[in-house]
């Protein structure tokens, strides 16, 4: 199987551009197609994350899940050479992403949008009038936290847009605007919400969550309420403090099996719609990592 991809350039690279791209050798880039020869316009995330648009990270997650991922191998004055990432093959990738997150010898890495700012992830090729926007590759636990905060920030932004007094955006930014990892603090580039439902996919996902809350079968809530009051279970002990007080105030005496069945069907449909995103796009399993060379041995999960 020939995994090599040649990306042809429309103009010769400037010397400083060659140096900047060579610093990224070993990093992952998305490709617009699977062809062995491609043009530079289909390289990176620039086509779904331009300077002129507010970032829709969910759209970028979808793109990363559907595109061809490749490792940058060589940079020359008139072309770039990459190796496609396919299941069953082992790769050596470099931890040269900005901002820097420490990787570990074994575990899982998630390929995700550049959620800490486009400028950190971009190499400008003025010679070819194109920006090469790299994704981030993060340890999966921190990638999960990032996604949680982006989605909840979108929900709060919509709440405040409808009724400014319902939430304090300073408090929202304090809790959702950054992540901490191994003693370091990282600011997220949270998207400003551009008017009613302006970020189609991110808004849709946030609405899925909001609607799903209303679709819980009433029998499920009544069972939880009864168990909390009268019985003990390890799971209940774990989640008891997180069950909202509103559950106790909902009228659950008049149960309808037919209504609950409809709720269950729609809720399961929503869950299936969300499942692909919660896999956090492409994941890499790591077998070894060298802190000296910043190189991980990994394969596509």
UniProtKB/Swiss-Prot annotation:
GO cellular component, one term: host cell nucleus
One Pfam family recorded for the sequence: Herpes_V23
Highest taxon of source: Viruses
Membrane-traversing stretches: none
Its biological purpose: Structural component of the T=16 icosahedral capsid. The capsid is composed of pentamers and hexamers of major capsid protein/MCP, which are linked together by heterotrimers called triplexes. These triplexes are formed by a single molecule of triplex protein 1/TRX1 and two copies of triplex protein 2/TRX2. Additionally, TRX1 is required for efficient transport of TRX2 to the nucleus, which is the site of capsid assembly.
Single GO MF annotation: structural molecule activity
Keywords for the protein's UniProt record, in alphabetical order: Capsid protein, Host nucleus, Virion
Localization (cell): Virion; Host nucleus
Family: Belongs to the herpesviridae TRX2 protein family.
Protein name, entry field: Triplex capsid protein 2
Self-association and partners: Interacts with TRX1 and major capisd protein/MCP.
Keyword Repeat in annotation: no
């Amino acid at each position: 199987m020939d995994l090599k991809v040649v990306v042809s350039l429309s103009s010769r690279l400037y010397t400083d551009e060659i140096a900047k791209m060579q610093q990224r050798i070993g990093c992952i880039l998305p490709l617009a197609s699977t062809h062995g020869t491609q043009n530079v316009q289909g390289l990176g995330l620039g086509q779904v994350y331009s300077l002129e648009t507010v970032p829709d990270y969910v759209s970028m997650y979808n793109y990363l899940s559907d595109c061809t991922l490749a490792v940058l191998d060589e940079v020359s004055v008139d072309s770039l050479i990459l190796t496609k990432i396919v299941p069953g093959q082992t790769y050596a990738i470099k931890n040269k992403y900005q901002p820097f997150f420490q990787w570990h010898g074994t575990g899982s890495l998630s390929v995700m949008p550049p959620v800490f700012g486009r400028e950190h992830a971009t190499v400008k090729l003025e010679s070819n009038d194109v920006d090469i926007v790299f994704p981030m590759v993060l340890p999966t636990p921190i990638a999960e936290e990032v996604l949680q905060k982006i989605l909840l920030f979108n929900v709060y932004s919509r709440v405040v847009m409808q009724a400014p007094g319902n939430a304090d955006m300073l408090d929202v930014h304090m809790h959702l605007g950054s992540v901490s990892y191994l003693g370091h603090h990282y600011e997220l580039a949270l998207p400003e919400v551009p008017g009613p439902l302006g970020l189609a996919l991110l808004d849709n996902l946030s609405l899925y969550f909001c609607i799903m809350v209303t679709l819980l079968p009433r029998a499920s809530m009544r069972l939880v309420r009864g168990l909390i009051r009268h019985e003990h279970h390890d799971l209940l002990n774990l989640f008891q403090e997180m069950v909202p007080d509103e559950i106790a105030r909902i009228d659950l005496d008049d149960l309808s099996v037919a209504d609950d069945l409809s709720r269950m069907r729609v809720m399961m449909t929503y869950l299936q719609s969300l499942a692909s995103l919660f896999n956090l796009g492409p994941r890499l399993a790591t077998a070894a990592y060298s802190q000296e060379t910043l190189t991980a041995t990994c394969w596509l999960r």
